[in-house]
């Protein structure tokens, strides 16, 4: 039986970024079904949308809602937009090298966007970001990583998750207990 403060399932951008932003006094376990690099975030070639300035909020919101056929959670979209520059700044601080144009960044206009607000790392944005996040996570003394481990079930009692049942590469099942469990499995898990 293993006990952690936080259990993170998934090693894409969301799982890794979460680990980097949790308190260093928390014991964290990150679990991935393959290797650290074996995820869709690593393969992503597209860019990241960022609010360019305050005047861009409404157009960015409308572009995103329209692209989602207005089925989006508007409050969640607004939060994403409002936090986008802070996230980009954090990624830059972690060493992510976005494409430059002159002294600034090279913003592109793609898909449903009405303005140029997309940042890239050549055509390997996902690989660039994930590689930098992986390197930073590996430096954390409070983080353990289980590769080649599959989530079998969540350990739930009442209305609270207490961890997960994992299967390792050899097929052995083990319970991992945590005060908090974060599912960062992406679109396909």
Residues covered by each model-derived region:
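N-terminal Rossmann-like FAD-binding beta1-loop-alpha1 element of flavoenzymes
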Residues: 6-30
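Structural detector for helix-capping/boundary residues
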Residues: 11, 149, 179-180
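Residue-level detector of alpha-helix initiation sites
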Residues: 12-13, 35, 188
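Conserved N-terminal/central alpha/beta ligand/cofactor-binding core
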Residues: 32-161, 166-168
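Core beta-strand elements of the Rossmann-like FAD/NAD(P) dinucleotide-binding domain
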Residues: 2-4, 170-180
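Residue-level marker for beta-strand->alpha-helix junctions and adjacent short loops that shape enzyme
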Residues: 152, 171, 188-189
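Glycine-/small-residue-rich beta->alpha transition segments that form the dinucleotide
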Residues: 178-180, 184-189
């Amino acid at each position: 039986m293993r006990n952690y403060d936080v259990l993170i399932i998934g090693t894409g951008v969301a799982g890794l970024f979460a680990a980097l932003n949790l308190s260093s006094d928390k014991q964290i376990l990150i679990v991935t079904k393959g290797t650290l690099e074996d995820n869709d975030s690593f393969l992503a070639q597209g860019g990241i949308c960022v609010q360019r300035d305050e005047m861009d909020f409404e157009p960015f919101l409308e572009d995103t809602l329209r692209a989602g056929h207005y089925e989006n959670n508007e409050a969640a979209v607004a939060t994403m937009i409002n936090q986008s520059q802070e996230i980009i700044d954090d990624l830059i601080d972690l060493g992510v090298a976005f494409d430059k144009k002159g002294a600034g960044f090279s913003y592109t206009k793609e898909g449903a966007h009405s303005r140029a607000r997309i940042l890239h790392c050549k055509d390997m944005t996902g690989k660039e970001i994930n590689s930098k996040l992986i390197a930073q996570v590996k430096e954390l003394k409070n983080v353990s990583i289980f590769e080649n481990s599959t989530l079998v079930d969540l350990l739930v009692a009442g209305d609270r998750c207490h961890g997960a049942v994992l299967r390792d590469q050899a097929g052995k099942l083990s319970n991992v207990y945590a005060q908090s469990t974060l599912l960062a499995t992406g679109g396909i898990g």
